[in-house]
Amino acid sequence: MKKAIDAVESAIIMDSEESEQLSGVMREFEEKVTAELAKQGVVANLFVGGSVGKGTCLPGIHDVDYFMRFDLKKYGEENISEVCESVLLGIFKDVLRLKGSRDYFRVKINDYEIEIIPVLYIKRINQAQNLTDQSPFHVNWIKKNVKARKNLNFDMRLAKQFFRASGVYGAESWIGGFSGHVTEILVVYYGGFEKLLKAVLKWKDKTIIDVEK
């Protein structure tokens, strides 16, 4: 197993050039948005989500997710999608608005697609007004577990690559597989990639897991 894992290491970790390119795009985006927030007097900040934010992304990724977190007290009764759009239009010529339980947005920098999800900055789950308000908690939960267990983020990448090669990676309807977040949860629950594989062999229909037990 170790030889097989070593053989795919280069396929699941970005090289320095790709990592620097991604960092440069993110830095440019964050600097522009932070400046525009200040210019418009909007009380909000950016929080990196998705696999990039959790440190579990695979090479070749050209999409980054951001949460634009709005002050709960000031914007709790406002349409924060409208505010978010105003900020983005102050920077980018082309801003794609996407429908959701709360509308979100997509912009491009070079060949990178950046999705921006407006959320309320909450400190407790029960303060959420929309499911997306809870999403940063999901990111922090993965990051907490990655920090607590050595090499867990490597195992998450490994599991994603394995599922992808097996044709079961992706929650899209035409795939019907495991999303990136669910893959990460499975690795946390079972304690690593190899343990996950062994558990999969014993799965039955409607296997239920509870990561807090």
Question: Where are the regions a protein language model picked out?
Answer:
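Non-catalytic peripheral regions of nucleotide-handling enzymes
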Residues: 17-20, 106, 110, 118-174, ...
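Short, conserved charged micro-motifs
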Residues: 74-82, 195-198
